[in-house]
């Protein structure tokens, strides 16, 4: 037994220059852990609360001094003396202190940072990497990266309503090779955008945020309907993959999308392409069935292997229909739908509303609950995709988590911005440490599909 001796929280800044919580933990025998809470831009209604101060005179109301104070004055005194290796007790104590379903009293940003810092301190004391502390001898599978190279939606000031267009190097033989393929494709995409005199500035997650001015002679609704911005983005990705010297498809690089459709779903229960509506001053909306047909069309025309949040978080019936239609050949990922919450994941499994769960630690708020969500997902025969948030730090915990629980997939941004690259570099370190024991499944990571 090694007791927690000290816990200290402070306010720091994330990749957007917005405050977040950092927590340090020390144990009696020299263990030390430090963790930083991430933050999302598009959030699900059932996510655990990210506690903000609300003082408009300071950081536009986004300060986290309340969450920091809760850690230092409420959580820390209760955890001092508890065994650092007893993660369940640590997390349960914090859940009891908060006492609310969505951690609205103490804030999930503070609770999560403490939970992760304790785990890191325990691993430090045992002098083993975090992934081995959490996963033991089974922790040896490197994830297929899901790299966000074109940003839209809430993540960028671009013409694209869908939030993320990603590449997945499923044909690579190792994680390091997968990263090389991804980097070369990212640079090829940049070259293509430059040749079209488009913007090569990057969004929150390091992907490009093009305006596609070159793709449309007229900015009227019929032009956008004839070739949607999503199709322009997909065409670009296929061209970039080829330009980099790789095959679009199962033997090379496939494509994933995050539609973030909850952001498009309005009170009329239709999906509105808001950015197109703004440009054209005309309404363009789809019913749930029409959106499903549109996504099916994209899947039939492009090498797409994964679609996240293809429908809104309240459109459970639509998710079930989408999974029935294309779930045998495409990974249907629930993010806003499940918010890493075992309660909603169980509901999704029963309804057959998806075949994959996105795992975001700050959506649920503790390491123990995150592990429960991963375990429930995998037992159902679904995949679990460990994910970052759009507001990140240099914290690399999710890299260790993906390996610890052999999730096989990780979503952590593009090939730019050090807050994203830090996770990839950590995975390269882990691959090196594992040596010949390292496994990279590639296409086999999609065990939920009929390949």
Curated annotation (Swiss-Prot):
Highest taxon of source: Bacteria
Compartment(s) of residence: Cytoplasm; Secreted; Cell surface
Positions annotated as active site in the UniProt record: 205 (proton donor), 360 (proton acceptor)
Keyword annotations of the record: Cytoplasm, Glycolysis, Lyase, Magnesium, Metal-binding, Secreted
Cofactor section: Mg(2+)
Entry GO MF terms: magnesium ion binding; phosphopyruvate hydratase activity
Binding site for Mg(2+): 258, 308, 335
Primary enzyme class: lyase
Protein task: Catalyzes the reversible conversion of 2-phosphoglycerate (2-PG) into phosphoenolpyruvate (PEP). It is essential for the degradation of carbohydrates via glycolysis.
Family statement: Belongs to the enolase family.
Name of the protein described by the UniProt record: Enolase
Protein source organism: Mycoplasma capricolum subsp. capricolum (strain California kid / ATCC 27343 / NCTC 10154)
High-level lineage: Bacteria, Bacillati, Mycoplasmatota, Mollicutes, Mycoplasmataceae
């Amino acid at each position: 037994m090694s007791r927690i001796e000290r816990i200290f929280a402070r306010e720091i800044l994330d990749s957007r220059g917005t405050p977040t919580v950092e927590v340090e933990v020390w144990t009696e025998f020299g263990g030390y852990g430090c963790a930083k809470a991430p933050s999302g831009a598009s959030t699900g209604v059932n996510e655990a609360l990210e506690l903000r101060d609300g003082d408009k005179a300071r950081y536009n109301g986004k300060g986290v001094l309340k969450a920091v104070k809760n850690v230092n004055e409420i959580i820390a005194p209760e955890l001092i003396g508890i065994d650092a290796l007893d993660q369940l007790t640590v997390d349960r104590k914090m859940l009891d202190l908060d006492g609310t379903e969505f951690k609205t009293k103490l804030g999930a940003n503070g609770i999560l940072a403490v939970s992760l810092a304790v785990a890191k301190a325990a691993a430090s004391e045992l002098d083993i990497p975090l992934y081995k502390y959490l996963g033991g001898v089974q922790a040896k599978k490197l994830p297929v990266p899901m790299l966000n190279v074109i940003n839209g939606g809430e993540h960028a000031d671009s013409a694209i309503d869908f939030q993320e267009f990603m590449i997945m190097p499923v044909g690579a033989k190792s994680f390091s090779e997968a990263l090389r393929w991804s980097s070369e494709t990212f640079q090829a995409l940049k070259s293509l955008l430059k040749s079209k005199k488009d913007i090569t500035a990057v969004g929150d997650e390091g992907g490009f945020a093009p305006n596609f001015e070159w793709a449309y002679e007229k900015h009227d609704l019929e032009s956008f309907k004839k070739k949607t911005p999503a199709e322009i983005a997909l065409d670009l990705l296929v061209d970039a993959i080829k330009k980099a010297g790789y095959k679009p498809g199962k033997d090379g690089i496939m494509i994933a999308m995050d539609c973030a459709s909850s952001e498009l779903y309005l009170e009329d229960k239709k999906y509105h392409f808001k950015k197109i509506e703004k440009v054209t001053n005309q309404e363009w909306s789809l019913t749930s069935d029409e959106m499903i047909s549109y996504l099916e069309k994209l899947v039939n025309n492009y090498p797409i292997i994964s679609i996240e949040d293809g429908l809104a978080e309240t459109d459970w019936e639509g998710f079930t229909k989408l999974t029935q239609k294309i779930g045998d050949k495409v990974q249907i990922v629930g993010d806003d739908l499940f918010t890493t919450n075992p309660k909603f994941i169980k509901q999704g499994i029963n309804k057959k509303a998806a075949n994959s769960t996105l795992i975001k630690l700050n959506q649920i708020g503790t390491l123990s609950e995150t592990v429960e969500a991963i375990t429930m997902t995998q037992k159902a025969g679904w995949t679990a995709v460990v994910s970052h948030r759009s507001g990140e730090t240099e914290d690399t915990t999710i890299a260790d988590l993906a390996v610890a629980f052999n999730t096989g997939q990780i979503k952590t941004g593009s090939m730019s911005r050090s807050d994203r690259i830090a996770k990839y570099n950590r995975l390269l370190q882990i691959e090196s440490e594992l040596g010949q024991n390292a496994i990279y499944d590639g296409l086999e990571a999609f065990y939920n599909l009929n390949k």
